[in-house]
Amino acid sequence: MNYKILYPEAFPVVEMQLNRGESIKAESDAMIAMSSEVDVEGIMEGGVLGGIARRMLTDESFFLQRMTAKRGNGTVLFGHALPGGIMDVDLDGSYGLIVQKGGFLAATEGIEIETKMQGLMQGLFSQEGFFLVRMKGRGTCFGSNTHWFRIYFCSAAGFAEFH
């Protein structure tokens, strides 16, 4: 799997080259185009309750899209509707990534996406709200890199803002 971020300054697009059998999951409105070798299916990451929590609490989609290259190597283009960049972050399993609601765009198959609730004081006084999106596992995550969204690394040692 190879990718590159096209037009990084204005309305960026991620061009993902999938080898046969590889897949990527993304927000339901993130895919712009795909080649004929790629199939799309709707999935509920985290089951029904995970989908409900993601939709009701974080403004993310109830369903995610899984795009799989089934008939040979394929290409998928995805992006978001907001102006600003797209950030790619590789996770190795030793830490996770937390983004504000609306900040998740796509991830490779080794990444789990879940809703995380902040504590009462953090939820009241932070600009992020009570619920965030957490990504963990091994793989690559793609998220919005605009001034509206903050990205945090999380591990057993705590949180650190990512710039």
Located regions from the model:
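Composition-driven recognition of glycine/serine/threonine/acidic- and proline-rich low-complexity segments
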Residues: M1-H163
